[in-house]
Amino acid sequence: MIKDDWPLVIPGIVLQEFLTGVTSDKSFQKGLDVLSGFNVNYADYEDHLMAARICSQCHKKGIQSSSIDAIIAAMTINLNGRLLTVDNDFKTISKICHLKLFQFASR
């Protein structure tokens, strides 16, 4: 991604989820220092509408999706971006909407 000069953006909800899992003040500050170098993007009205559509489409197909995953997917779609993730739930979500995933290069 960096090699291809793609902008890196972190959704605000991902920043929150990441820092919520930190157990010490020192680790929290260290994580915040690392993440502060990235642009943080916040969901807007259109992102929330798209997330609702994604959840609805998932549920119609019998797929369980969290609201947080749906908002992350929606923000990525609305930015015409690619999502870098190791969470398999997004692979499932990408099959029912226009979510593009970043493909890791094989070694």
Predicted regions and their residues:
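A generic structural signal for well-ordered alpha-helical segments
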Residues: M1-I2, D33-V34, C58, T76, ...
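A short secondary-structure junction motif
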Residues: I13-G31, A52-K60
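Acidic, PIN/NYN-like endoribonuclease modules and their adjacent C-terminal/linker elements
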Residues: N78-R107
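Positions that flank functional sites
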Residues: Q16, M50, A73, K91-T92, ...
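Active-site neighborhoods of divalent-metal-dependent phosphate/nucleic-acid chemistry enzymes
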Residues: N39-V86
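PIN/NYN-family metal-dependent endoribonuclease catalytic core
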Residues: M1-S24, N41-A43
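A short acidic, often aromatic-flanked loop/helix-cap motif at beta-alpha or helix-coil junctions
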Residues: Q16-E17, E46-M50, S106-R107
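A generic structural signal for alpha->beta connector loops
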Residues: D5-P7, G37, N80, H98
